[in-house]
Design a protein with these regions (language model features):
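Metal-dependent peptidase/peptidase-like ectodomains
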Residues: 281, 375-483, 490-495
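Soluble metallo-hydrolase cores and metallopeptidase-like ectodomains found primarily
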Residues: 168-194, 258-339, 362
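His/Asp/Glu-rich mid-to-C-terminal helical/loop segments that flank catalytic regions of hydrolases
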Residues: 499-536
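Extracellular/luminal Protease-associated
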Residues: 92, 100, 153-266, 270, ...
Length: 536
């Protein structure tokens, strides 16, 4: 599958869709109020090797989920982030250290560990950027360059990287200084083609939420009109919810293949693309667009190279070659710790692997082969999972029974205000019936949790791209649609949580962590051993 077909939360698209894509509230064909943070049930019921029979299936009892150990995994991952920006961006030294830590952890847990590496298109942020605006002093222009060090009385506003502005996916570089007096052209919501044409050779400034709705569409329009760079200001997404009355900028990706197509087969290396907060953007508007001020925009970014990303996997070979895989992405956006997206999911993968390691030590060889993987490259377009499925395609086509994806499987600590649901969806009707059955068991066994949290269940067994088809918003996508050249539809099950308004912002840290939601996540996973095997 080409990357322009990926509709992941990172590649596509609407700023206004970001929270909906992560909470999957638009996906549900059915929802059930049940006990506990559903990831528990989700993994229990979907990672199970499901088998539906005339007789009720005994799913067994639950194993103990170690919340303290899981929190330790979270802390370990966060400690590997960038020393200043805090993220574990794909292709960086931080992502490499993370993958090596994971690979070693799988080996320590008794799995056969393998560290896959792939060379993929990836942009890199090479140094601290600078974004400033300046109102010239009283003597600027009289033999003294406006906004130069000698311009007495100048007023310079320095915007804070990560808080006020964020570099966007596959941005190029820029080096505009005050002395160049680069013009910034107001593009409104992007619907007026004449404004785009007037911005040729200049910096375009677009207000998010308009008819040109995705980063890809914006960058394509900028290329078509030969803009020097592009600024997108957030005035419509999560305003007044996480930082005063401001609308915090978020990182979004762009489709690499669409940009190549628009630019004649090469990347626009000299076109920077950043997003700004509402408050910061309004300062820029006042000083530069509607005033006599100047802009400095220095973005040291490379977007035309391939970088190495990593996929560590731990495998325990069972009595059969039938394969169950559970995974989450270990990379984050470049400018945030990613405590929820997706450190929470990756740590849960580790805890499930640890529980199975303990179970195998006590009960012997499992019936099926178990594999745990984490993915690099997710935030920029599912690069790691796509490359892994491509490499392992024959084996996966023949043996994959089920892939389970854990991406932001977490409920915010303020669940009463922000939402208390966890979402489970799958693309197989039989698997869905087992999810329902295990959910009902969990509800009976955990009545207090049933009152506290809500679970949503969804079945998406339609064709690709259809409203009832499996969405491609995370790393499960290639496991569903890329087997045998798309001729075999793989089975997958996906878990999301709710309430992470800090998604893709610098504020995605442990201050919003709800450890209870992780503790309940996956302790029923072992039940796959209680269900007879069938061929997919």
């Amino acid at each position: 599958m080409s990357d322009d077909e990926v509709i992941s939360a990172e590649i596509a698209e609407e700023w206004s869709e970001a929270s909906n894509r992560r909470s999957a509230l638009d996906f549900f064909q059915s929802s059930t109020a049940i006990a506990g943070i559903l990831v528990v049930l989700f993994v229990s019921s979907t990672f199970l090797y499901f088998y539906l029979d005339e007789e009720p299936v005994d799913y067994g009892t639950s194993l103990q989920f170690d919340a303290e150990r899981t929190r330790g995994y979270i802390d370990d991952l966060l400690a590997l982030g960038h020393p200043t920006w805090e993220g574990r961006m794909s292709g960086t030294a931080e992502e490499q250290a993370t993958a090596e830590y994971i690979n070693n952890l799988f080996e320590e847990l008794g799995y056969q560990s393998t560290l896959h590496t792939y060379e993929v298109p990836m942009h890199s942020v090479n140094s601290e950027p600078s974004l400033r605006v300046c109102v010239p002093g009283a003597i600027g222009g009289i033999g003294i360059a406006p906004c130069s060090p000698a311009d007495a009385g100048q007023q310079v506003t320095t915007f804070n990287h990560r808080m006020d502005y964020v570099i966007q996916g596959f941005s190029g570089e820029s080096s505009f200084t005050f002395d160049q007096n680069m013009e910034v052209v107001y593009l409104g919501d992007g619907s007026d083609d004449s404004l785009w044409a007037a911005a040729e050779g200049k910096i375009g400034y677009i207000v998010g939420g308009g008819s040109v709705s995705s980063n890809t569409d914006i960058m394509v329009k900028a290329i078509e009109n030969d803009l020097a760079s592009i600024i997108r200001v957030n005035k419509n997404y999560n305003c007044g919810t996480i930082e005063g009355n401001d609308c915090v900028p978020i990182f979004k990706g762009t489709s690499h293949s669409a940009i190549l197509d628009a630019n004649g087969g090469t990347m626009p290396t000299g076109m920077a693309f950043i997003a700004m907060s509402k408050d910061a953007g309004e300062i820029l508007e006042s000083v530069v667009i509607n005033g006599t001020g100047r802009i400095e925009m220095i973005m040291d970014v490379t977007n035309d190279e391939e970088l190495t990303i990593r996929v560590p996997c731990g495998t325990y070979y069972g009595k059969s070659s039938e394969l169950l895989i559970v995974g989450g992405h270990h990379d984050t956006v470049y400018h945030a710790p990613g405590a929820v997206d997706d450190t929470s999911g990756t740590a849960t993968v580790f805890e499930i692997a640890a529980m199975f390691s303990e179970y195998i030590a006590e009960n012997g060889e499992p019936d099926r082969t178990l594999r745990f993987c984490t993915w690099g490259g997710e935030e920029e377009g599912l690069w790691g999972s796509i490359a892994y499925v491509d490499e392992m395609n024959q084996d996966l086509t023949e043996n994959l029974r089920l892939y389970i994806n854990l991406d932001m499987n977490h409920v915010d600590i303020d669940y009463e205000t922000r939402g208390n649901s966890v979402t489970l969806f799958t693309n197989d009707a039989d698997d869905y019936k087992h999810i329902e059955a295990i959910a009902e068991e969990y509800k009976k066994d955990n009545p207090l949790m049933a009152e506290k949290y809500r679970i949503n269940l969804g079945l998406y067994d339609g064709p690709k791209g259809a409203a009832n088809g499996m969405p491609c918003n995370s790393d499960h996508c290639p496991f569903v649609y890329n087997l045998d050249g798309g001729n075999t539809i793989g089975r997958a099950a996906v878990c999301y949580g709710s309430g992470s308004l800090e998604y893709h912002t610098y504020l995605d840290d442990t201050s919003r962590l709800n450890e209870e939601s992780l503790r309940n996540f996956c302790y029923d996973i072992w039940k796959l051993h209680e269900v007879p095997s069938i061929q997919p």
